[in-house]
């Protein structure tokens, strides 16, 4: 079983959303708005997973009472085109929370791939691999949730207490998450859609 650090995954996702929405605004509303992509293209379990994390980190936030579309609008994942009244998902909304098929239709060159080349035995090429195989909706939020624990599971977690709360996070874990987050943020997914993460024993 993979244990998810809700706080860490939430902050990774929050940072990516802010960066993608900011970049879209800088390039203009046309790039931000995806015509014909609606809430039907959102993977609701993915969005609900993020909302659980959001509520955990912001228990009193007013957005917690919004429906899914209104919540996405507040994040910048869904917009209304004021020129003609049309509405739909943004690039950030689809990439972060979309169903796999609409994501692949809109970004047909996008590939998300994780390969673990650590702890190899004999002539093994890899000890673990995550790629799209039809068992998960391949959006960025799911990729984050599945890859971050794999990247950090071999890093020791010393027993530390913050008052009565156990503190498991370390500078090493934070550095790995930050590097992973920056890789995605700085990748131009509208041009070059390859997200490839490789893990080694000695790198």
PLM features: what roles do these ranges have?
Residues 2-193, 198-203:
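Active-site helix-to-loop segments that bind/position phosphate- or nucleotide-bearing substrates
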